[in-house]
């Protein structure tokens, strides 16, 4: 920054990217609830870091192979081995109770798996590990298999919810070639980053991100950073510029604007209402400056955000925390209530100071000149009992749009029952992640026993394929079809961990889907980077 006075207007640079961290790891949804955070810290983070320390040369070589970017290879240099050792030691020394909570889950699972006779569970309460006593209810399913239910609200009030492990990391796109994959590499305070030791609910977060469009004075910037514990070689002054943003929002005066935001994100906008679906906003830099919709192009107020499911590429705190100051309400699918693999999105978001509405399947929410409807979502979760997933239909100003994200169609009878909600669609948007990873890639840390390969290989994170999507289209005959949510954009590789080519099965399925829908004179468009569709008001 220049030295032109304390009251000079300063804006957060468009190329600034932000990563919310939990114990130096990228904070995806399962690192917010205490028990799942403990499991991933114990069974994923420590395991990968210890593997790196013991075999760092192998990790360094693997990290250079693009096709391995989504694997469990820690992307750090040999010079950072000692820092990883320190992070291991700090985690095991200072957060011993937290790790013991993870072990308590394993012990409780073992206790209940051994109770096979189907007799009352009441005597087992005395054998529940001490750290979980009073936080779990022991239950049977209808087939007399014992399990437990977590009391999530109480756990958020306990010592196991540790916001002191939350920190903020800032970087400049011009200083990095590629961001490491988020699920395999902790974020160290290196020369290219500024890390701020404060929790996600600090007003600092909202004030900083407001300054993308609402300038701060130098005095205000200094005051925000004053007293904060800072680490890393990037000076906070370098995050700001005197140049106001050149990319600004566009107003909608009539009809409905559908704007694709990249990956799984959409914006639906009328004159009076703005709705985002699964927003993941890319950071603008010189390489992609004209290819994306950036933070500065979003409206000053976002009435609703609809989230489809609790995967890191759909509930993205990197984006949501940057938008929190301008979000009205977040709408989320109803939760099972207490299942380890299915933490409550409502509780999670409320803990991060979002105004959150939880809706049941087929429940409708009235909005200005329209309705938001929760549509049942099957698939993409490895057959785990996870209820926190929903597709959405949005009716606005007489237009009707469906956003299916990664939902699959294993039984077309569901969509036959749903036709009253899906008739007269202007837009049918569906993902085609038909070759997902084994479910243990994402949920392995929650398993307390080794999962056989025969199970892993069949239970995958699969969404729709061409055949499944075509069955739905044949029923509902939408005007427009978009395929999206595949992570095609290379700038999202850091959280998707995948690359595609012409021979990729997903690409072949999109071609097959497009050929099939020609019989109904409906074109399929595969979305990439950004796309606008204006739906005029014909009334």
What residues fall within each predicted segment?
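Short acidic, glycine/proline-enriched helix-loop-strand junctions
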Residues: 450-451, 455-459, 471-472, 476, ...
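Active-site-proximal beta-strand elements of phosphoester/diester hydrolases
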Residues: 257-260, 274-278, 371-378, 400-406
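Active-site-proximal loop/helix segments of hydrolase catalytic cores
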Residues: 314, 318, 378-475
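Metallo-beta-lactamase
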Residues: 229-253, 335-399, 515, 519, ...
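Divalent metal-coordination and catalytic microenvironments
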Residues: 268, 278, 309, 330, ...
